[in-house]
Amino acid sequence: MENQISITSQYKAARLAGLLYLVAMATGLFAEFYVHFPSTLIVSGDAAKTASNIMANERLYRIGIANNIITFAIDVALIWALYVLLRPVNRNLALLAVFFRLVETTIACIAIINSYVAMQFVSDADHLKAFDSNQIQALSILHDTYALTFIVVAIFLGLGSTVFNYLLFKSGYIPKVLAAWGIFSSLLLLISQFTIIIFPEVEKTIIPACYGPIAIDEIALGFWLLFKGVIIPKMEP
């Protein structure tokens, strides 16, 4: 009876994880592509223009921050659902994946706070008038740390996603080809971020190549878990 309850919880967790994957992907893409990229607000290397853009589009910028907070709140729920689903496969590895992903969300929230602080100063005309050009540049650098911090975020996302996808592959809950693609795309993301740290000049070249595969993986996995669910082998009595 207890085993049956556990399996039922896994089925429900799988459906929930699928839904959360898709919702988090939608909110994440909105924030990154509509607010941050292509940069209608943020102009790299031009602090004054960035400050002017944020002041002129403060509501949009605030929506982007709120959207990011929602995205990472969803991520926490997703991490929990994946843990419930994969705990019976290997509890220790599932916990390791949870810790990796929680570090990811924690760092991301710190980045969001920095972005919010920069906006608070930049959007206040009285504050802005009190700053000289060097101080405005410093505020711009504070905002630029958002992008830099997300390199570290992506590293921990890659680590956690690799472990979760390994457990999905080992469990046989989903098609192995889908889990294998998840492992590949997660490792690709992980390696690419270290490459950017060591060779920053290649960042613009490899970003599409490293984020594209994992985006495809999370969308495909989300649809599969939500609409197909998982196949959990029955334990021998």
What is each stretch, according to the model?
Residues M1-P237:
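Hydrophobic, aromatic-enriched alpha-helical segments typical of multi-pass transmembrane helices
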